[in-house]
Design a protein with these regions (language model features):
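N-terminal alpha-helical signal peptides/signal-anchor transmembrane segments
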Residues: 3-33
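Intrinsically disordered, low-complexity polar/acidic regions
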Residues: 2-5, 30-217
Length: 217
């Protein structure tokens, strides 16, 4: 039991550190007129996440998009050098998000480029909590888009909402209307636990429910 409690505390400490990383991303957006792809790359690179935050799969930004904005959004991202870009999955929905920045932009993370996380129920629930509360929210267990056919791990995502600057955010409705997107991180569970506990060979089976709420506690 003592070992379980120590593990739980270690996980909580690390998750709070990851939350602060996301808050730094929100701060970057709030301090800038425009955060470009290069700016986001430079920001995440400066964090040296592999060394300082082992276990994190990346740090990204998912843009919130209304249906009448979708085509212009796709054209803009394609003009940045991604001619095949689209928002996935295809189909008409009342609202969309799209992962437009995710660093490091390696082979795994490129698999998530353009994915609408609102299209999947578990991710949607966490994103709605983050949007409505203004706080960090963590999803339940999912299989990340980053997974390949080998070494498939359970995963989860941490979200922090980004709102328009200079608007009132006192009510849920105001927060919903001011939403611009989410700074977020995906986590692969085994990699995360190795990063926290420093154990390379052990198979980890951790209950994600301890994080599945409106805030990390």
């Amino acid at each position: 039991m003592q070992e379980t409690e120590r593990t739980r505390e270690a996980v909580q400490v690390r998750m709070h550190a990851y939350e602060q990383v996301l808050r730094g991303g929100i701060g970057l957006f709030n301090a800038s007129e425009h955060v470009s792809r290069q700016t986001w790359h430079d920001y995440v690179s400066s964090l040296n996440i592999n060394e300082n935050f082992p276990g994190i799969q990346g740090i990204g930004f998912s843009q919130y998009i209304l249906p009448d904005e979708l085509q212009r959004h796709i054209e803009r991202i394609r003009s940045e050098g991604f001619p095949e870009y689209t928002v996935k999955p295809a189909g008409k929905r009342p609202e969309y998000t799209s992962i437009i920045y995710l660093e490091p932009f390696d082979a795994r993370n490129q698999r998530a480029f353009g994915f609408d996380m609102l299209s999947e129920a578990t991710r949607h629930a966490a994103m709605a909590r983050a949007r409505d509360t203004g706080h960090t929210a963590v999803s339940g267990k999912v299989i990340l888009k980053q997974e390949t056919s080998k070494d498939i791990q359970s995963g989860f995502l941490m979200y922090l909402p980004l709102y328009r600057k200079g608007v009132n955010l006192d009510s849920v409705e105001q927060r919903q209307n001011a939403l611009l997107g989410y700074v977020y991180s995906p986590f692969r569970m085994t990699n995360l636990m190795r990063g926290i506990l420093g154990q390379e060979e052990k198979s980890f089976d951790i209950d994600l429910e301890i994080y599945d709420g409106t805030e990390i506690s």
